[in-house]
Amino acid sequence: IMMAYHRERGVETRLVRIFNTYGPRMRLDDGRVLPTFMKQALSDEPISIFGDGSQTRSFCFVDDLVEGIVRLLYSDEVQPVNLGNPQEITIGTFAEEVVALTNSSSTISYHPLPEDDPKVRCPDITRAFEVLGWTPSVEREDGLAMSLDYFIEEVGKLSGPRAPFRKSERPLGRMGSRGAVQRRAKLRQRARTKNPRI
């Protein structure tokens, strides 16, 4: 519909295809894999995997997505642009990363794979790089670390403080909590430097 308005009426439009995005403020009950895994891991419940865990997905941190959208808004590109992270990971490996990050005792629970579940889901971001100069910059390990405190707080609202999980034991990866905050600040500053109108 938007493209029709652009072609017929000259309306200025921008089209973005958003692929798997994650970060703080995700709803625990939205059905997506990260909040589901986080909720289960922080509650020491079995991690639910559908199929054998070999299917791949890719995850783009919200800060990267926002930067891509802003660049598109200030560009002259009218064709659809894919925004996502092309780095694939198997669901099984992703579950293991979440368990390790949360210091959880959760085990993996396998369930039948839905018939319509895709084996691979990964964006082609060639156009985003060519016309916007955009590629995601936040490593998955860092993005998960920057999201952890939020999920701990949200799960705590449901069941109270998680007794087995002590803050001093939290494995936040190479960034650490202070590094996570600093990285987010640098991402925002970089976006402003690349486009002063942000």
What are these model-derived regions, one by one?
Residues 20, 24, 41-190, 197-198:
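C-terminal substrate-binding subdomain of Rossmann-fold SDR/epimerase-dehydratase oxidoreductases
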Residues 32-34, 99-100:
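Glycine-rich, phosphate-binding/catalytic loops in enzymes
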Residues 1-14, 42-43:
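Active-site Tyr-X1-5-Lys
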Residues 11-32:
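Flexible, glycine-rich beta-alpha linker
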Residues 2, 37, 95:
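Aromatic/hydrophobic pocket-lining residues that form π-stacking "cages" and hydrophobic walls in ligand
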